[in-house]
Amino acid sequence: MTQHQDAIAPHGGSLINRVASETQKQDLLAKGDSLPRVQLDKRATSDLEMIAIGGFSPLSGFMGQADYEQVVHHMHLDNGLPWSIPVTLSVDEGVADSLNVGDLVRLDDPTGAFVGVLELTEKYTYDKTQEAVQVYKTDEMKHPGVKVVFEQGAVNLAGPVWLLERQAHPQFPSYQIDPAASRQLFRERGWNTIVGFQTRNPIHRAHEYIQKCALETVDGLFLHPLVGATKSDDIPADVRMRCYEIMMEHYFPEDRVILAINPAAMRYAGPREAIFHALVRKNYGCTHFIVGRDHAGVGDYYGTYDAQHIFDTLDAQALGITPMKFEHAFYCKKTLSMATTKTSPSGPEDRVHLSGTKVREMLRRGELPPPEFSRPEVASELAAAMKA
């Protein structure tokens, strides 16, 4: 393989681009006031952007009923391609009744800004309980993903989209790297194997450990923190990004790591979302994807390693990206280093278990996470942000 070839093809073979050209954009903006409109929530706004930039390839729009049913029940698109999360645009029945198949629908973000259009090809109802149970493994409203499903509209709108305006990420301009751009960066660096890492939490020592373990076996590491909609108690995106900047400056080899933002929203769908996250990183050009403990989980809804086991149920060749599975890492007091049960000689009493949840709890109590939890510079940044 030469430096000028992509290490891996996008999911489905082609990278989707539904970002309107300047000519298209001006034409659509001129029509905007005359179009029927739908207001998107934060998640749908993120989904629109991810579809348009190719992050959700091969999707070119919000799912029709055939794809939706296959994804919910069988984890693949209607054409058989693996896909684990429904990507839909849901509206109330009244809104759906006011629209006709064939309409060009104006899409506004939560502030009312005109951000895209939908070429409406289909309207269909769906079973919310079935979606919740199949995708999230529960129908409890306290699950944040399930809550979204039950509170959204009863009708899904389907069809191709065009994106006119990106979500604003003014604090991260240099990290807004789309799939086409990340692939170009990987080619320029001559990387043939790239491992992606997904997170919604500030980096702690366990994350750093598994990232570096993975980096020992590949050409490059793609750090891809999520900056779309998350739970209200998650650490804000700007704080998480500052922590990663600190790590890049002091603790990672800069020529082996690329940091970029992921504009997607969290679903908290555990095992299914682990597959989804892997496919998204495949579109960004990653050949491998790190799957750790309780990936994309919330509460106690999923088993510790369910998100790893689900990869064994899919055709590896059809999936096309290789999961790198890691056990739960901890700080070993006996060896004074990070380890897992595979490498540590210590018993439970000498293991300091780390998690984003524990870090958040310490910060809320006004405690500075110790060096066993976080690098000192990161701990100071988190503490300062919590006070502010």
From Swiss-Prot:
UniProt KW Nucleotide-binding keyword: yes
Record has ATP-binding as a keyword: yes
Any one Pfam family match given in the protein's UniProt record, by short name: PUA_2
Pathway: Sulfur metabolism; hydrogen sulfide biosynthesis; sulfite from sulfate: step 1/3
Swiss-Prot/TrEMBL catalytic activity: sulfate + ATP + H(+) = adenosine 5'-phosphosulfate + diphosphate
Highest taxon listed in the record's lineage: Bacteria
Family: Belongs to the sulfate adenylyltransferase family.
Protein name: Sulfate adenylyltransferase
Organism of this sequence: Acaryochloris marina (strain MBIC 11017)
Lineage: Bacteria, Bacillati, Cyanobacteriota, Cyanophyceae, Acaryochloridales
